[in-house]
Amino acid sequence: MRYLFPILFLTTLAIRADDYTGPRPPKPDMLYLVHASYLIPTEATEASQEGKKDDTTYTVAGAASPVRTPLAEPIFLLRSEKIKADTLELYRFEVKGGRRQLTLSRKRSEKSGPFHLSITKLDKDLYRVEADEALENGEYALSPSGSSNAAFCFEIY
């Protein structure tokens, strides 16, 4: 009887740890696009930054991301070590001159974002990140807010 409570407690913890049974990202701090039971790594890159008056333009090389999805409300998984899931923001690029660009200004544009995200903690360091609204076809990037220019790019077609 003396051991019954600790055994029940440990059993409860083991069951709770196994709640999420889906795929798990192989690398930390990388966003993976979920397609059924498959994980597709997003295009991880560093955006170059250029500032003019009230505008800041972020640029990524290439007219299109090689990572594509037909889903208007894509779902991503993140195994977090350095990147905090709640700092992620979703933006839409404009394609100009063979490059993807995002210009942020004091005059906010709902067309480029940030778009609403829903973030759900699945496990100790595992998060589900999903667009909380239907997105139009185009080029997009998830990026942690702050001083980083890291961009996790994908295309909706």
Residue ranges and their predicted role:
Residues D18-L102, G146-Y157:
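Primarily secretory-pathway and cell-envelope proteins
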Residues P74, F115-H116, D125, A150:
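Residue-level marker for the onset of beta-strands and adjacent loop->beta junctions
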Residues S118, R128-E130, C153-E155:
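Generic structural detector for well-ordered beta-strands
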Residues G98, S109-K111, N137-E139, A150-A151:
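A short local loop/turn or secondary-structure capping micro-motif enriched for an aromatic residue
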